[in-house]
């Protein structure tokens, strides 16, 4: 039987608690860290539209940043990616990634964006 892990996070401002929770969840998963070294990892966000994190429409960038941090720690090439509704152009993606906080998440974690 599989495991479920829950952690109550009061605020997205507590990045240390979020990072610890994500690390614990992934460390306790069935993923083999032997697969990670040098692997390419794509983190698929849920960017429905050009909205700020405070509007709670898209995946919060702190969650994406912490996931990216985890895989970067294992020498992975991390790409934050999505294909929101509308035209798939660099200009469109840049606007959505900037508004949603994904540009900062990528910069902070060492990940890249898919454009």
Stretches found by the model and what they are:
Residues 1-115:
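N-terminal and secondary-structure boundary signal
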């Amino acid at each position: 039987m599989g495991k479920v892990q829950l952690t109550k996070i009061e605020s997205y401002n507590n990045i240390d608690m979020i990072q610890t929770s994500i690390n614990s969840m992934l460390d306790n998963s069935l993923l083999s860290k032997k697969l990670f070294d040098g692997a390419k990892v794509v983190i698929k966000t849920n960017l429905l539209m050009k909205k700020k994190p405070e509007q709670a429409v898209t995946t919060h960038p702190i969650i994406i940043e912490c996931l990216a941090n985890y895989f970067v720690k294992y020498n992975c090439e991390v790409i934050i990616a999505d294909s929101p509704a509308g035209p798939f152009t660099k200009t469109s993606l840049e606007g959505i990634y900037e508004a949603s906080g994904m540009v900062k998440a990528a910069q902070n974690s060492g990940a890249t964006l898919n454009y």
